[in-house]
Amino acid sequence: MIKKMKSYINMNSTVTTLGANYLVHTGYFNTISRLKVCTIASYRYYSTSKSDSQSSDLPPVPIFTINNLNNKDSIKSSRILLKDKGGIYSFINTVNNNQYIGSAKDFYLRLNEHLENKKSNIALQKAFTKYGLDKFIFCIYEYFTYESKIISHKALTDLETSYINRFNFDNLYNFKAIATSSLGYKHTEEARLKMVDYYKDKNNHPMFGKTHTEEALGLISKPGELNPMFGKKHSEATKASMSEKKNKYPLGVGIYDLEDNLILKFSNNVELAKYLGISKVTVGKYLNSGLVYNKTYRFKPIQD
């Protein structure tokens, strides 16, 4: 493994294997926009506004790694280490040393999202399929702990960008050199050309080998005024019926205590999210993972 990661790791440095409490209680902390950022391996300051001349020429050193990504039990055993800890992570391909760099507010949830292909990078997923999960290592370059989940998104993406810029962009699965939310984002010319090159291989296109149904083709071929639904609106009853059919949880979802007692019931995860004042994405994460929310509740589908 050391030979495979040689281009990323300073061999004179110590890659620390962290115990459950080590992540929280040790290390050198530097506050960046309310983030507690820890850089154990190289003890360096990292700022989003000022570069560190002493470390800018050195590749980042992982402070924690996980192998056996194809072993679900191995992933579950890392939960205590990764849960409620965020920062900068990477998936490194041990065959060619290409990697994907990302940021997360919860390493455990984000790792599982990638492994289950939920909101993951397309190029990274193709590499998982081509090489196998056993040829990848999950690495943490920098982390922070927090008591509240309300964390500056910009500070985190700025930190991610600083790490992306430390590597040759051609060796990254990332499509963007600047980490941002995709909302309202316009790709740089460099990123656009990288995506064009990626999709030259038809196998990389999400619709390659797939066909639309006759019904879908009929609707596509009738845009605008030719479409039978043009200018029409669904009735409230029809909308309710369509919503019910699309609902993943036909009996609704509920908030349960830690003893599995139902506290409140909702028609869907959107209603639950509105009640707690959180996003439906957050609710979905906890519904799918079965993890405890706010150390008090679990979100679960209502069963018969």
From Swiss-Prot:
One of its GO terms (molecular function) is endonuclease activity. SUPFAM superfamilies: DNA-binding domain of intron-encoded endonucleases, GIY-YIG endonuclease. Pfam families: GIY-YIG (PF01541), NUMOD1 (PF07453), NUMOD3 (PF07460). The keyword rRNA processing does not apply. Residues 84-175 form the GIY-YIG domain. It is an enzyme of class 3 (hydrolase). Its EC number is 3.1.-.-. It is found in: Mitochondrion. InterPro entries: GIY-YIG_endonuc, GIY-YIG_endonuc_sf, Intron_endoG1, Intron_nuc_1_rpt, NUMOD1, NUMOD3. GO terms for biological process: intron homing. It comes from the Eukaryota. Its main location: mitochondrion. Keywords: Endonuclease, Hydrolase, Intron homing, Mitochondrion, Nuclease. The keyword Nuclease applies. GO terms for cellular component: mitochondrion. PROSITE patterns: GIY_YIG. Encoded within intron 1 of ndh-1. Mitochondrial DNA endonuclease involved in intron homing. To endonucleases of group I introns of fungi and phage. This is Probable intron-encoded endonuclease 1. It comes from Neurospora crassa (strain ATCC 24698 / 74-OR23-1A / CBS 708.71 / DSM 1257 / FGSC 987).
